[in-house]
Amino acid sequence: MLELLLQPFNYNYMVKAIWVSAIVGAVCAFLSAYLMLKGWSLMGDALSHSVVPGVAGAYALGFPYAAGAFFTGMLAALAMTLVRHITRLREDAIIGFIFSTFFAVGLLIVSLNPTSVNVQSIIFGNILGIADEDVLQVEIIILVSFVILCLIWKDLLAVFFDESHAMSIGLSPLRLKILFFTLLSACTVAALQTVGAILVIAMVVTPGATAYLLTDRFGRLLIIAIAIGAITSAFGAYLSFYLDGATGGVIVTLQTLVFLPAFFFAPKHGLLATRYRTRLKRRHPPVHLPEDNL
């Protein structure tokens, strides 16, 4: 029995897949906590699709896909940030416009160069076939991103919670947002290898959403989100060996299975707890004393 459980670790490609999935899942979860705080989950979706033209263009021109993905991801992030600052358009309109534009350009490039673009790798990822140089590239991206996030997490919290207060204490919201989106773009590029462009959104939303239901303290939220992201990603890669299924699909399914109990049974913000409090308020409405009795 033990030999069967340890069997995936006998294969170098599985060890690499589990390791890379764990570190990518951890840092994506770190970022997801801020996306939940700001209500920017759609931003993660937009960035995950905005890297498609970069990947497709890099494949078509023979350049490293990571460089192309990072370039278009950063371009999309900067466009969304700057357009928000110089126009009166709502954020959801800006995100929807840029998301659809970049994804359309990516599909156009794929249609023009169908033989030079590995569409399946873009959409579903290819973590089991990741090369050693790609592992090193992902490790560098994740390490740099994690160190920067650990250094500025309180500054980002101030900006995402209250920009006016952040400015009053000498922080630059615009610069910190650009830095955040730079890190988000870099981690999106890393996550492409793990789950592909379509499912990246789950890795930068689900862990943070789950943790958001379980605690009101941001420090704890970060720890819970990172733990969920790392464990589900590593175990998903491990489990995919036995299921013989898409690694990205297994990872995201596991994250959803962790989210659902929190959604229903979280002690304070779960669906059942919320409904219970609502019923109590209906049965025992607050008593308002007349002003003469105060």
Curated annotation (Swiss-Prot):
GO cellular component terms, semicolon-separated = ATP-binding cassette (ABC) transporter complex; plasma membrane
**InterPro entries listed in its UniProt record:** ABC_BtuC-like, ABC_TroCD
- Write down the Pfam families for this protein, in alphabetical order: ABC-3
The record's listing under SUPFAM superfamilies reads:
ABC transporter involved in vitamin B12 uptake, BtuC
Q: Which CDD domains match?
A: TM_ABC_iron-siderophores_like
**UniProt subcellular location:** Cell inner membrane
Q: Tell me where it mainly resides.
A: membrane
Which GO biological-process labels does this protein carry?
Answer: cellular response to iron ion; iron ion transport; response to zinc ion; transmembrane transport
The keyword Cell membrane is assigned to this record: yes
Membrane topology designation: Multi-pass membrane protein
Q: List all membrane-crossing ranges.
A: 17-37, 51-71, 93-113, 140-160, 169-189, 194-214, 221-241, 246-266
Keywords linked to the UniProt accession:
Cell inner membrane, Cell membrane, Ion transport, Iron, Iron transport, Membrane, Transmembrane, Transmembrane helix, Transport
Say if the entry is tagged with keyword Zinc: no
Family per record: Belongs to the ABC-3 integral membrane protein family.
Q: What does this protein do?
A: Part of an ATP-driven transport system YfeABC for chelated iron.
Name the record gives this protein = Chelated iron transport system membrane protein YfeC
Protein's gene: yfeC
